């Protein structure tokens, strides 16, 4: 199963111009997540602090979002209420890397029209949806799991609902991760540009936020203005 971690790669342009098509510095009309993550693979757990810059159009409205049922909200700077009658079973995920979305809880939050700061939500818990390999072609993929944190590796995507999911709109994000001492040699991989030790960021609109982690060896090679990165899983 975790042979799927053997190779992860990214490619990025070096020193892009902010005037190039597709760049959206500080896009104000998209939800932006700023994630601080503590991972303990041995305990199959994570602790997350998410500071969200909300689109202006959301101010003064009641919002709903979903979060993995294995995670519990521990703090928020706006009142949040869980809808006890709206626990949603796992379902099909469109345009995702896996077939099924994790079971989630649904929450409600009222955002004042005068709200000018960032919505801050902290949460923690475990995610370990073990894959059942129904045929040989799944042996090296994550097609049968919505998300997993374990001593063998971490794979989280939109289907894991590990980040508050409001709707199907595009988002931007930055993240930084720290590991428990037992995984101190691990490395994270996500979209966008590396930002310090185990940090990633992108202002390009995304459909989801990946978080992949294991003990990798990192290789890079440049070809003109493009730098290719390969993350090989250590045996």
What is the predicted role of each segment?
Residues 1-8:
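Bacterial N-terminal signal peptides
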Residues 9-47, 74:
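N-terminal, polar/Ser/Thr-rich
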Residues 31-38, 104-110, 157-162:
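Short structured motifs
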Residues 32-34, 45-51, 60-62, 106, ...:
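Intrinsic-disorder/low-complexity, polar/charged segments enriched in Ser/Thr/Lys/Arg/Asp/Glu/Gln
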Residues 47-70, 158-180:
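Surface-exposed beta-strand/loop patches in extracellular or lumenal glycoproteins
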Residues 50, 200, 217-235:
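Juxtacatalytic substrate-recognition/specificity segment
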Residues 63, 68-141:
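A surface-exposed beta-strand-loop module
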Residues 122-216:
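Extended, low-hydrophobicity, Ser/Thr/Pro/Gly-biased non-transmembrane segments
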């Amino acid at each position: 199963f975790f042979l799927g971690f053997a190779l992860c790669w990214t490619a990025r342009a070096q020193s892009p111009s902010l005037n190039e098509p597709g760049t959206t510095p500080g896009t104000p009309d998209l939800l932006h997540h700023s994630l601080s993550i503590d991972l303990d693979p041995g305990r199959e757990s994570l602790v997350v602090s998410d500071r969200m810059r909300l689109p202006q159009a959301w101010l003064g409205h009641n919002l709903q979002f979903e979060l993995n049922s294995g995670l519990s909200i521990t703090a928020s700077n706006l009142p949040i209420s869980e809808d006890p009658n709206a626990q949603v079973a796992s379902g099909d995920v469109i345009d995702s890397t896996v077939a099924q979305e994790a079971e989630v809880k649904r929450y409600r939050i009222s955002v004042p029209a005068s709200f000018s700061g960032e919505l801050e939500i902290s949460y923690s818990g475990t995610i370990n949806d073990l894959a059942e390999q129904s045929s040989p072609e799944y042996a090296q993929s994550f097609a049968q799991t919505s998300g997993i944190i374990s001593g063998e590796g971490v794979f989280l995507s939109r289907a894991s609902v590990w980040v508050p999911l409001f709707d199907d709109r595009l988002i931007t994000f930055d993240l930084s991760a720290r590991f428990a001492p037992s995984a101190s040699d691990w490395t994270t991989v996500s979209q966008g540009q590396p930002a310090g030790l185990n940090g990633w960021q992108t202002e390009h609109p995304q459909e989801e936020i990946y978080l992949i982690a294991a003990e990798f060896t990192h290789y890079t090679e440049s070809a003109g203005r493009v730098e290719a990165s390969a993350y090989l899983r250590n045996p």
